[in-house]
Amino acid sequence: AVVFRHLVATGKHYPGDIVYFAVADEEAGGTHGAEILVRDEWDALNCQWVLTEFGGIPMHSPAGTSVLVTTAEKGLGWRRLTVKGTPGHGSRPYGADNALIKAAEVVRRLSAYRPTPQLDELWAARVKAMGLPDELSRKMLDPAALHDAIAELPAELAGNAHACSHTTFSPNVIGGGVKTNVIPDSVTIEVDIRTLPGEDNEEVDAHLRAALGDLYDAVETEVIKHDPSTASATDNRLWETLSASIAKAYPEALVVPSMVTGGTDARFFRNQGSVAYGAGLLSHRVDAGEFARRFHGHDERIDVDSLRLTVQLWLDVVENLWDN
């Protein structure tokens, strides 16, 4: 909004259309915002390039500074799992068919599940940007050694490293039971599943079967939301323009394409053929580790310098994107 206000105030005309597109439901999955508008109003939104959230994150290491720009994002495979039991009186728990106890075991197995990592070019670029010691870098690129290698990373980097290299399962919502003295006959578990490129509903179901083992057939599974992973290439003018603009703030930095572990509205545009990047620009005080710590946490914020840098980045891109 700040950038567009400035563009309007200058009165300058550009060779193409520049569209400001704001919706309010990205955190709710984008279903009634970007998704429906991209689907039904594409004639109005049709765009070659898209810039959105979650990018321009500096990563400092002994090897220097890298700036992560989001070119891909993991997919959504959200599931609602329902575990059934038999109701009864809570004063007689021995031998009871308690749905909550079975649900607890489902959650435990999901937490303990270790899917095979998927290491691609984006992963290799991220590992290089970390500037780790040679031996640890080697382990980070070895699927057999990766689990132990991630455990050696600082806590603020380990979670993101794991999520960028694995399909993940996070049981986040549970519901069941009607009264303190009634054994529950049904418990639901909502699981945030984030998939890697190439994985669809069938692969999610295969993961769940592997994770739950003999409990799988006893659990009812419902798809809450499904969106495959998406990505944009970097062999284009927008990437070149972004890289040149980032270099004004971080002259020595390497601009690194990266995958975001959450979901953004970029996926809807990529599915229509647009090149979409997550690209702001954060200050040196909000590096990758600090950003990950704050995200959806108690202290979710950026500093004023990051806002200033992001505004300037987008103004530079608008000014320099057009072919001469």
Identify the residue ranges that each predicted region occupies.
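Sec-exported extracytoplasmic/periplasmic mature domains
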Residues: V2-A9, W42, R108-P115, R209, ...
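C-terminal substrate/ligand-recognition segments
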Residues: V178-D214, A231-I246, R267
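Alpha-helical metal-binding/catalytic segments enriched in His/Glu/Asp
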Residues: A1-G30, R79-V83, Y94-R114, V191, ...
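Short beta-alpha connecting loops at secondary-structure transitions
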Residues: T65-V67, G88-S91, H226-D227, R293-D305
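Acidic/histidine-rich catalytic neighborhood of metal-dependent amide-processing enzymes
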Residues: A1-V69
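Active-site-adjacent substrate-binding region
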Residues: V107-P115, K128, E135-A145, A233-S283
